[in-house]
Amino acid sequence: MSLTRRQVTSAALAAVPVALATTGTAQATQRRRTLYITGDSTAAQKYADAAPETGWGMALPFFLREQLEVANHAVNGRSSKSFVDEGRLEVVLEAIRPGDFLLVQFGHNDEKSADPTRYTEPWTTYQDYLRQYVDGARARGARPVLATSVERRKFDADGNAVPTHGDYPAAMRALAEEERVALLDIQALSIALWQRLGVEETKKYFNWTATEQDNTHFNPPGAIAVARLVAAELLHRRVLAHRDVRRLDEEVPESWITWPDAAA
């Protein structure tokens, strides 16, 4: 389905920055920085009709302090290409300001070679589209951050977690080095986590229900676990400082996840 620019802009308004907290008059007089998320369904906001499916972007604010806001613009089914072609990156870049962050995680849908509206080739068009995010953020005084795609739940017969993203993570790593962009290697970190948890325990992190066995999307514990990886890497890669993060070693109750009603 094609979207008009008006429809894209209207949809993007639903992704307004979520304030993590409001404290003190000093903070009220100083604009807080915003971390914008661009990505696919693994990060996107989910609504009541999709529960218990949860995007990791819904849980990220639990690990960031009040001086940061999160604006989750990730959308189900998008690739680095279709997000640009639909005008969604333009909407983000119109809102982003100096000192903000643009976190970019695409790959799941870039892999769909049968769909020309989404497919990108890892070492050419994928990198070309990612450069548009990097260049757009830098041109506006914001800091781009690339994140390799979180891994799906897939194990071989011997119980080994199997990578599913082909050359896309390597292509992003190479681009990050070439462009001197901070890289969060969520693909490597998540597959290591799934390996530690094992075949059965990982089912508790993905959207396995009585009617569905979804090995791509998360439930609340899975989204919280991936968001914790993202926040820890933002600190480790010196994108954020210790004063910007919280709860990295603390339990976050899954009851904190809520699903609003979808906008009409």
Model-derived features: positions:
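N-terminal export signals
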Residues: 2, 7-28
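Acidic-and-aromatic substrate-binding clefts and catalytic sites of carbohydrate-active enzymes
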Residues: 49-52, 80-86
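Serine-esterase "nucleophile elbow" of acetyl-processing enzymes
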Residues: 27-74, 90-98
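Cell-envelope and extracellular/periplasmic
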Residues: 35-37, 41-44, 64-66, 73-79, ...
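A recurrent domain-boundary module in secreted/ectodomain proteins
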Residues: 251-259
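Short, conserved aromatic-histidine micro-motifs
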Residues: 70-72, 245-250
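Alpha-helical cap/lid subdomain in secreted, periplasmic
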Residues: 88-220, 224, 229-246, 258-262
